Amino acid sequence: MREIRFGLYISLALLAIPFHPLHAGAVANPGGALPVVGDAHNKLIPVAVKGYDGEVARVLKFDLEVMGCKIVPEGAAAYLLAGGNRNSVNGILKDAAGNFEFNKRYNGGNLRQQAHALSNDVIKAITGRNGIAQTRILYKMKTGPRAYEVFVSDYDGHRPVALTSDNTLTESPLWAPGNGEVFYTSWMKIGGVENTTVIRHKMKTGKRKVFSRVKGLNTGGAVSP
């Protein structure tokens, strides 16, 4: 079984790479501290969801529950999300009195990404706050006896993409401001010599540069705002 280890930076604050909005007027999560809609001071929001099946139904349920909703039968709901996911995801949100909040259809990306976008729009309509369902997270994963690689994935662990394939120890992956690049510490060999090295890695191109490799310990790369 592969072990996924999330560093402290993920436990306390998620920095986001917003997924590009799938509809006009959408506001992507700008990143920063993880907004917990249903924290200890708030009651869970009763929402009924109908008309969806398969993976889309599971994604909507997961997203909405993570962001502070409770999925309930229609008769007990403060809000009803109704729609479908044949070919693309669509959704109509209305409150218990029948007042419409929105009626949207999503294009672009796959059905899972469209479901995440719909979840965020539901939270935005109900609470006025941006959701986290399109957040991307950065972490390291053990891939061998003495090897950890850096990965990025959706916030729910799906769509993982390996950023490194160095087959060596890797530590402390960290987003740079703006989320266009990341820093991490690698025990890579250069010229046959293994030494801790802070790497600067550009997300768009995959290009990376040695940021710090002085003799001794190089670790914990961070960027000032």
What are these regions (language model features)?
Residues K61, G75-D121:
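Amphipathic beta-strand/beta-sheet edge segments enriched in Tyr/Trp
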Residues H23-F62:
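A structural "domain/chain start" motif
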Residues R136-K142, E181-T185:
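Residue position within the beta-strands of beta-propeller blades
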Residues P145-V161, T185-V210:
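Beta-propeller blade-edge and WD-like acidic-aromatic loop motif
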Residues Y9-P18:
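Bacterial N-terminal signal peptides
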Residues M1-I10:
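Bacterial N-terminal signal peptides that target proteins for export
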Residues A125, T168-T185, R208-K209, R213-P225:
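Conserved beta-propeller blade repeats
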Residues A57, K61, E65-A77:
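Interaction modules related to DNA damage response and DNA replication/repair
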